[in-house]
Amino acid sequence: MRASGILMPVFSLPGPYGIGTLGNEAFAFVDFLAAAKQTYWQILPIGPTGYGDSPYQSFSAFAGNPYFIDFRLLAADGLLTEAELPAPQPVGPVDYGALYQQRPVVLHKAADRLLASPTPAYEAFCEAQSGWLEDYALFMAIKAEQEQAGLSDWPDDLRTREPAALAAAKERLADEVDYYKAVQFFFYTQWNALKTYANSHGIQLVGDIPIYVSPDSSDLWTRPELFQTDGAVHLTSVAGCPPDAFAADGQLWGNPLYDWPRHEAEDFRWWKQRIKHATSIYDVVRIDHFRGFESYYSIPAGNTTAAGGKWVKGPDRAFIDAMHEALGQGGIIAEDLGYLTPEVKTMLAASGYPGMKIMQFAFDSREPGNYLPYTYTRNSVVYTGTHDNVTTEGWRATASPEDVHYACRYLRCTPKDLTEAMIAACLSCVSDMAIIPMADWLHLGAEARINTPSTQGSNWQWRLTTPLTSLLADHIADLTTLYDRAPAAE
């Protein structure tokens, strides 16, 4: 079925408390999507973030980001007083340092009220999520006690989960463990309410999960045997991407690599649990760096660039078969951008999952692949660009004149109209799903870029300051209907 949606991170929503949340503005965005005749709201990973603020480097593959908890909803539930709500702030770029200092103070007050008289809903949540929640809460409590030191810098007995040290920590940090569990209850209560509202208005949530976990995560700490580590939970190899036209030294991500033979020996149980969790909170799940299941780029731990890495064979079809067994064949988007061998293409075809097409890449002379629209298939998802791309207006301003000229010739438009023409090319193409970033619908420039890979500084900070008008919703709805992507009338 042809359909379309909008890419909009939760943190980019407007709102009074320094970052987008799961409150009024998220519900209003659902209303906007419905008015614009969209079917999907695609977001970025929603896990708790740490150093670098990247949603792709989370403390847990299962937990939710406390920054997204809406204080006004907590007040409505009687967990905060009006006097305890922070003063409203003008909408501007996310200041993660300020959030780190200010948010826990408010959340502790709400958690104390809940824990003084735990509700049946809270107790049921803790029981249902015990498979990851207990370890995550203890991990975060120890991390706080260690002054936020990364896992690799923890004392040996805590890092390696020596039983006596673990038991002592559970007793010593019992109150903080309860706090982190309460915060997760707040997050998932609000998340589930938003998802219910979205689904009731015909909007499906497209989630995003990184293929790898963070080196500073409860996942690595809890099950180090599932990763390429030594006996002391130190990484022996790390993840990344080889050098290419976009990054001369490649990309050194630094994530733990999986011990795939161990996963296969366990029938991929951890991955099945992860995907089942994701499909319980999202309607569709995009898996980042899907090609890493066929073969992955391995860099010796301690290297300062990705240039010295090598490709290593992954689980390939065995993983795909396990996912089909657990979930069937639907509900997954495979992020298949970058270097694709025939073996990767064979694996993707066997999965049945749609891959991704990036319209900007079609006209980028640095891109070796062919992303021109005539190459697309129905079983694919097309984007003007993703969170890793500059906005289309930004691309027009920064791409080579030759590339812009080629795009305008191909799309039969002037440079001034390039963004609208590229959006139309996405909506009109054969791909079953088309996703347009919110910033492109607003014709925003490079100031609205979400992330520049392999850089630090101003990533993951963009927030929406432009009003989403009924006029814009009508324009989007008109194009969506024109290209036969509007939901069927009830």
Language-model segments: what does each one mean?
Residues 1-11, 27:
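N-terminal regions that are enriched for targeting/export leaders
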Residues 9, 53-184, 188, 213-435, ...:
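Alpha-amylase-like alpha-glycosidases and glucanotransferases acting on alpha-linked glucans and related
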Residues 44, 204-206, 210, 284, ...:
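Outer-envelope exported proteins of Gram-negative bacteria
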Residues 180-213:
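Conserved, well-ordered alpha-helix/loop/beta-strand core segments that scaffold catalytic motifs
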Residues 34, 191-199, 324, 348-349:
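Surface-exposed amphipathic alpha-helices with a cationic face
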Residues 35, 158-159, 165, 462, ...:
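Domain-scale activation on soluble regions of proteins
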Residues 24-49, 277-282:
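Catalytic domains of carbohydrate-active enzymes, especially glycoside hydrolases
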Residues 24-31, 189-197, 271-273, 418-422:
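Short alpha-helical segments and helix-capping/turn motifs at coil-helix boundaries
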